[in-house]
């Protein structure tokens, strides 16, 4: 009967185990654990190295290109001639300036953005300087010009008040023009008032002019009556000037004045007395004087 004897070193090692037949066999489970531990350590090392590589790549992307004065001069000269160079032109510039084509392309892109921004700012400044001062001089703020007008204050204003006459407008003052003319409006002409006459002064025997029409025309004296003046002032616009309004002098009033002047001159004019034949002559004498 054969017995498998183990040495002391084999008996102490946990990797060996006895089979049913008694032959020593190596334990593979311990070896698998050792391999898994080594693989995990290698993966951890690779994971630690990956973030470092990513950081290095990001730092490389964020690097700024420092151009020399000669390179900038060449790039600026090309940009003045052509703001959108094609691929071949960019490659030529890259050869001249000792740069890569990608850096030249990025430089032109940034330079165009800077140029567009400067153009917008210049246009805004030009519009502000050219038109802003003119509009500010002509147009005053709304609250300053119309501070006297507010909502729901029409009932407090009297009919005789004149806020426009007391209100001064800077635009009209600069032009020496008042918003409402100081010349009286709707006032009868003084020439008509001075030449008006009563119906008793107008002769009824004026040829071509009936006396009734002259009497009707004589009623123009009533224009200066107090009742008419009060009526005009009461019906006047509450925002008009306190001065009497102005009336347009048409040709009808002037012709009326000339007609009255002619009538007055005709009344003062006296015809020479006509010598009538002597009434003491008899009819016989008339017959004798007549030629046969």
UniProtKB/Swiss-Prot annotation:
InterPro entries tied to this protein: HD, Homeobox_CS, Homeobox_Pitx/unc30, Homeodomain-like_sf, OAR_dom
SMART domains hit by this protein: HOX
PROSITE patterns attached to this UniProt entry: HOMEOBOX_1 (PS00027), HOMEOBOX_2 (PS50071), OAR (PS50803)
Acyltransferase keyword on record: no
Domain of life from the UniProt record: Eukaryota
Cellular localisation: Nucleus
Family to which the UniProt record says this protein belongs: Belongs to the paired homeobox family. Bicoid subfamily.
Biased composition (Basic and acidic residues): 25-40
GO biological process, one term: anatomical structure morphogenesis
Segments for region (Disordered): 1-55
Motif (Nuclear localization signal): 260-264
Lineage: Eukaryota, Metazoa, Chordata, Craniata, Vertebrata
GO molecular function terms noted in the UniProt entry: DNA-binding transcription factor activity, RNA polymerase II-specific; RNA polymerase II cis-regulatory region sequence-specific DNA binding
Short motif (OAR): ranges: 254-267
DNA-binding region: 60-119
GO CC annotation terms, alphabetical: nucleus
Keyword line: Developmental protein, DNA-binding, Homeobox, Nucleus, Transcription, Transcription regulation
The protein's name: Pituitary homeobox 3
Keyword Transcription attached: yes
